[in-house]
Amino acid sequence: MGGAVSAGEDNDELIDNLKEAQYIRTDLVEQAFRAIDRADYYLEEFKENAYKDLAWKHGNIHLSAPCIYSEVMEALDLQPGLSFLNLGSGTGYLSSMVGLILGPFGVNHGVELHSDVTEYAKQKLDVFIRTSDSFDKFDFCEPSFVTGNCLEIAPDCCQYDRVYCGAGVQKEHEEYMKNLLKVGGILVMPLEEKLTKITRTGPSAWETKKILAVSFAPLVQPCRSESGQSRLVQLPPPAVRSLQDLARLAIRGSIKRAMRQEATRGGGLKNTPMFKRRRVRRRRMETIVFLDKEVFASRISNPSDDTSCEDAEEDRREVAERTLQETKPEPPVNFLRQRVLRLPLPDPLKYYLLYYREK
């Protein structure tokens, strides 16, 4: 699936194309897509294809086309504080984007069939938290991934506000999927070759909307153990944040609010331009020679004459460097990090407030 929009040169251009084609229609979804670079979830040797509107698969690792993820994110109608279940969570790309919208008091669970893909998703999540420039701009609901068949979820599991299934669902499993939803919840899944949005309007009432035609690999049927029993998937219990974690969120939130107020008043931090020290160059000199009361102006050879070609070449290099600096965007400044590091606190507490991030 995919190919509905033009390829981009980078992640932002891909998002621009998805917006222009009306696949991305809301600000929250746009912000989430821009915050996480799709290429970060590709293997290094395949990253050149990351900004094409195409699905990608390598072994068990799979990413749907950007236009599909866009429609899914829009159909889920995500809001802060909701609970989300991703069936077939794969690389964790979608779950991480969802986590940016859910915020710190949401629930973000994923079930993945293949254990190697679960580990891949955990590695990508760790890299995002440690190194992404976007992490400090959001309050993140960190995904939790478990391995298992999503058709074998324990019957006593909690229900969710939002559910997405990333594999083709047959009619026989429709009721099973619906029962994972709370009343008022939304389920998005490929049902009989159509991306379908189902809203639970009551204990036994549903509204169904077909979004677009899609082609997904079907759900893998459960394998019975030797005893004939199913291997039930136990989803993570809803986590209760510690007082220490809540204090971290409150402090970071206070700093962010102060920064927004300063920016509104025009007193926020700004990137300071970098100035390059001018190079001092020796110049050729006119030498005055006195001969028998007659004055002659003569240009006497100076060692610097031999460097005239070098000077011209250096001039050209400086012009090229200035041009490159003018066209190259300045690296982003993490103002939140700067503020935290200036707090009158012990270093271990500062690093805790920064989630021990590398930048």
Curated annotation (Swiss-Prot):
Q: Which GO terms describe its cellular component?
A: cytoplasm
Region described as Disordered: 301-328
The segments labelled AdoMet binding motif in the record are 85-94, 160-164, 181-191
Active site (catalytic residues): 64
Q: Which Gene3D superfamilies match?
A: Vaccinia Virus protein VP39
Q: A Pfam family this protein belongs to?
A: PCMT
Q: Which residues form a coiled coil?
A: none
Region annotation BC-box: residue ranges?
A: 240-250
Keywords, sorted A to Z: Cytoplasm, Lipoprotein, Myristate
Question: What GO biological process, any one, is recorded here?
Answer: protein modification process
InterPro entries hit by this protein: PCMT (IPR000682), SAM-dependent_MTases_sf (IPR029063)
Where found in the cell? Cytoplasm
Using the UniProt annotation, give all residue ranges assigned to the region (CUL-box): 343-346
Residue spans with biased composition (Basic and acidic residues)? 314-328
Q: Which family does it belong to?
A: Belongs to the methyltransferase superfamily. L-isoaspartyl/D-aspartyl protein methyltransferase family.
- The protein's name in its UniProt record: Protein-L-isoaspartate O-methyltransferase domain-containing protein 2
Q: Which organism is it from?
A: Mus musculus
Q: Which gene encodes it?
A: Pcmtd2
